[in-house]
Design a protein with these regions (language model features):
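A helix-coil-helix interface module used to build multimeric assemblies
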Residues: 1-213, 220, 224-232, 294, ...
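Catalytic-core signal marking the mid-to-C-terminal active-site face
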Residues: 2-29, 64-65, 71, 293-448
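Generic, well-ordered alpha-helical scaffold segments in large soluble proteins
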Residues: 42-47, 98, 102, 137, ...
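Proline-centered turn/helix-capping motifs that create local helix->coil transitions or kinks
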Residues: 104-110, 198-199, 280-283, 318-322, ...
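Short amphipathic alpha-helical segments with heptad-repeat character
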Residues: 135-143, 147, 154, 184-187, ...
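Alpha-helical coiled-coil oligomerization motifs
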Residues: 158-161, 202, 276, 283, ...
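Glycine-rich anion/phosphate-binding loop at the beta-strand->alpha-helix junction
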Residues: 193, 240, 246-332
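Active-site-adjacent "gating/activation" loops or surface patches in catalytic cores
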Residues: 223-247, 251
């Protein structure tokens, strides 16, 4: 059976491939190999620039051709690496051998080939390649989609800023609010957590077999290898080098990044559920597309499927993000191999995340505001002005105002405009205060 959209096991690579395809440039096996080659090549160039004595005669004009090894790397190249891995049974060693083949193709580089992967362990490559790919994926794909969602919410908040709406706390009528303000709550929350994500450092482990530069130091004790590593990771890769490690990354900062993404996802789940409720309450209708079917049995159905799809995908994403953030920082002694297979799954929750964000955006863009229903609910819930009345009566030193309004409104009898106004007329307050109270309605008692 050939692998395609219909035979893929994961819906990320099957049903939803159209939404996640860009992530293949960062988290596929091909992408991981390309990032590994990039780190190996840049490391070799950095050794030349140092320079190590054996590399001082390397022709700097060839740096461009070296970088072309990863810049022009394609699926055929990746297939060759996998072919080599079939012999070595070691993925990073296969990358090293592939690069040596490319050096041979350039020609004249035989004296320099043994400085490919010099002094390094596999995790010096993996623990730079993975955070580098994550950094690029967040910058190029995930963050722009979150920004697009924030922009859509901000636009709606402005459009609906003057639309009064009955609030619900504990599922019951509460002091009125404005629809635009409630939408802005989500834009504000997402922006705060997006800022938090941007502040997270993406760190890398780079220090040899057990994090001490043993091989580097024994071969060239005259060099400051920590300073070299700091500069290489920062200037060549745009990451921050972890100063104290075992053979592998501490993964604490990676965990913080994943937790930051999870907080963003949690806010979107909250958004999805609220808009699902607003649609259920008929505060919004949904645009109907000709030919679409809402139910295999009930022809009339127009379901909020986009928000439901988003919520489901975010649930999967957050479960994996939480597992990754909790598992990766834990490794036996100087390392065990459990992080290796786990790291390969970083793209999975991000795939579900981008599917979800696109679904939420699709759902939002199908909304049709039903002001008539929103207004009718306000007209039907005059009890919510009780807070306003009792607060003004407190200001006027009226005796037991809260209790008076409680006795009036906390019953099983419906409160109407007439009921409220009759209560106000019977109050022992000035005509000016009565007029002030009479002016309060569920439509204008919306705060600031």
């Amino acid at each position: 059976m050939n692998l395609d959209l219909l035979t893929a096991i994961s819906p990320i690579d099957g049903r939803y491939r159209g939404k996640t395809e860009r992530l293949a440039d960062y988290f596929s096996e091909y992408a991981l190999i390309r990032y590994r080659i990039r780190v190996e090549i840049e490391y070799f160039i950095a050794l030349c620039e140092l320079p190590l004595p054996q590399l001082k005669d390397f022709d700097y004009s060839l740096f461009g051709r070296l970088r072309d090894i990863y810049l022009t790397f394609d699926e055929a190249g990746a297939a060759r690496v996998k072919e080599i891995e079939g012999i070595t049974n070691h993925d990073v060693k296969a990358v090293e051998y592939y690069i040596k083949e490319q050096f041979d193709a350039i020609g004249g580089l035989e004296p320099f080939k043994e400085f490919i992967h010099f002094g390094l362990t596999s995790q010096d490559i993996n623990n730079t390649s993975v955070p580098l790919s994550l950094k690029d994926a967040l910058c190029d794909v995930v963050v722009p989609q979150v920004e697009e969602l924030i922009k859509q919410l901000t636009d709606y908040a402005e459009e609906w800023k003057e639309v009064p709406m009955l609030a619900k706390t504990h599922g019951q009528p509460a002091s009125p609010t404005r629809l635009g303000k409630e939408v802005m709550v989500f834009a504000y929350r997402l922006q705060k957590q997006l800022d938090s994500l941007r502040q997270c450092e993406l760190t890398a482990k780079f220090g040899g077999a057990t994090g001490n530069y043993n091989a580097h130091h024994v071969a060239y004790p005259e060099y400051d290898w920590k300073a070299f590593g700091n500069k290489f990771v920062s200037e060549k890769l745009g990451l921050v080098r972890e100063q104290w490690t075992t053979q592998i990354s501490n993964y604490d900062c990676l965990g913080a990044v994943l937790d930051a993404v999870r907080r963003i996802n949690t806010i979107i789940i909250d958004l999805d559920r609220d808009f699902w409720m607003y649609i259920s309450m008929e505060y919004f209708k949904q645009k109907i597309k000709a030919g679409e079917v809402g139910s295999s049995a009930m022809p009339h159905k127009v379901n909020p499927i986009d928000f439901e799809n988003s919520e489901g995908n975010l649930g999967v994403a957050n479960a994996v993000l939480q597992f990754l953030a909790q598992k990766l920082p834990v490794s036996r002694l100087q390392r065990d191999l459990t992080d290796s297979t786990v790291l390969r799954n970083i793209g999975v929750p991000l795939g579900h995340t981008v599917i979800a964000i696109q679904s939420t955006l699709k759902g939002l863009r199908k909304l049709i505001l039903n002001e008539e229903k929103i207004s009718a609910d306000l007209d039907n819930t005059w009890a919510v002005v009780a807070e306003a009345i009792q607060t003004i009566l407190r200001r006027e030193a009226y005796p037991h105002p809260y209790e008076a309004l409680k006795a009036l409104t906390r019953t099983n009898h419906k409160m109407t405009e007439e009921t409220i106004h009759q209560f106000i007329k019977e109050l022992n307050v000035s005509d000016e205060v009565k007029a002030e109270l009479m002016a309060i309605t569920p439509h204008n008692y919306t705060g600031i």
